[in-house]
């Protein structure tokens, strides 16, 4: 499922 970044993971950089 896509997150806020639109990726299959949540890159919280």
Swiss-Prot record:
Annotated Gene Ontology cellular component terms: extracellular region
Task: From the Swiss-Prot or TrEMBL record, state where the protein is found.
Answer: Secreted
Q: Name one GO biological process term.
A: neuropeptide signaling pathway
- GO molecular function (one): neuropeptide hormone activity
Residues that bear Leucine amide: 13
**Highest taxon in the source lineage:** Eukaryota
Alphabetical keyword list: Amidation, Neuropeptide, Secreted
SS bond list: none
For whether the record's keyword set contains Secreted, the answer is yes
What protein family is recorded?
Belongs to the pyrokinin family.
> What is this protein's function?
Potent mediator of visceral muscle contractile activity (myotropic activity). LOM-MT IV seems to be a more potent muscle stimulator than LOM-MT I, II and III.
Q: What's the protein called, per UniProt?
A: Locustamyotropin-4
* Provenance organism: Locusta migratoria (Migratory locust)
Lineage here is: Eukaryota, Metazoa, Ecdysozoa, Arthropoda, Hexapoda
